[in-house]
Every structure is written in structure tokens, then in C-alpha cells.
Curated annotation (Swiss-Prot):
One of its GO terms (molecular function) is 5S rRNA binding. Part of the 50S ribosomal subunit; part of the 5S rRNA/L5/L18/L25 subcomplex. Contacts the 5S rRNA. Binds to the 5S rRNA independently of L5 and L18. This is Large ribosomal subunit protein bL25. Gene3D superfamilies: Ribosomal protein L25, beta domain, Ribosomal Protein L25, Chain P. The keyword rRNA-binding applies. The lineage of its organism: Bacteria, Pseudomonadati, Pseudomonadota, Alphaproteobacteria, Rickettsiales. Pfam families: Ribosomal_L25p, Ribosomal_TL5_C. Belongs to the bacterial ribosomal protein bL25 family. CTC subfamily. GO terms for cellular component: cytosolic large ribosomal subunit.
Amino acid sequence: MVVSIECIPRTSFGRNSANVLRRSGFVPAVIYGKERENINVAISVRDVSKHFAVLSGSGVVELSCEGKVYKVVPKAYELHPVSSVVLHLDFVFAGEHASKFQVPLNFVNSGKSEAIRLGAMLNIVKRTVLVRCTAANLPKSIPVDIENAKVGDSIKFSDLVFPDGVVPLARDANSVVATVVGKKVKAGTVAATA
């Protein structure tokens, strides 16, 4: 489901005008494009708060501005260092050209993992992965199945499965994404606890 958000055009720029916008209840934002001119907009703080999970993620968003609808993908956001208020949003046009995106990793089946059930812990080293794809092929997350992981196992980038049209940009395929740590369990102990 694509989220649609209303925005207004920005005509003045710079720190002072951005602060005036923020005091008026808006967050400044920019839509970047390779073959298009950048578009400066502002989104209400209420809409940013309501849809922050989407705006900080990797899905397609529709920004409506004065009757025009722009399909965009969130690229980055800036938070205030103390209050964690959103100060600025960056988007890129959701075109047919491939772009780089940070996609979250989703660790699945931890409840089915025998090692986790017996007290081992999943040590997550990376929470996102850099990929190249079009906005149409951009996944919400990359699943990392840990059902068969045992104590001492390392899950690497080379173990991840990417959908068609999504190319991982990891510099080293042997980079570790997560490890399973804890005491090794003997075979007799597993039968006794079951």
C-alpha cells in the first residue's frame, strides 16, 4: 500500500526560512532527481509523525503538492540531536533508473531456532544492507532466516537471498550480518529438555 501525503511548495531557502517553517508546524524536504530539477517542499509535522515509519523506511510514497503527485522514495532524514524532532527529509524520484538504497534486514524464525530456544542469543552485527535497484523493485526488507542457525554460526552477506532486480552492494560477501552466541548444548541435553 502506497502512502499519500500532502505537502506545500517551498519558495524561500536557507536556515532562517527553514526555522520559520518549523515554527509554523512544517518540516522542510527536498525531492532529488537525476534527470529532473530538485523540488523543495514542506510537510506538516503531524503528517511526518503519523507516517514516520514509512518516511524513514524504503517504500514508495506519493507526495501531493498543488495538484501534482510525485512518486518518491525516502532517502534520508535529519533528527534534532536532543529532542529527536525531524528537522529535514530527503526523497528521490521513484523512476525507472536504479539507485542505491539502504534496506533493513528482517531476522525471521528466531522462535523456531533450537539454539535460541535453548538460551543462545542472536548478536546482530548489521541491521541494513546497501542494494541497487529501481523503486519498483525496492523491497521493504530482506529476510534473514535463522531457523537452522546453531551456536557459533555466523550469517554472512553471501547467505542472504535477494529478490529479482535487487543487487547487493556489499564490498565483501563474507562480511558477517549476525552471529549466534551462547553455550553449546550436548545432544543428550536437548532430548532431556524436550
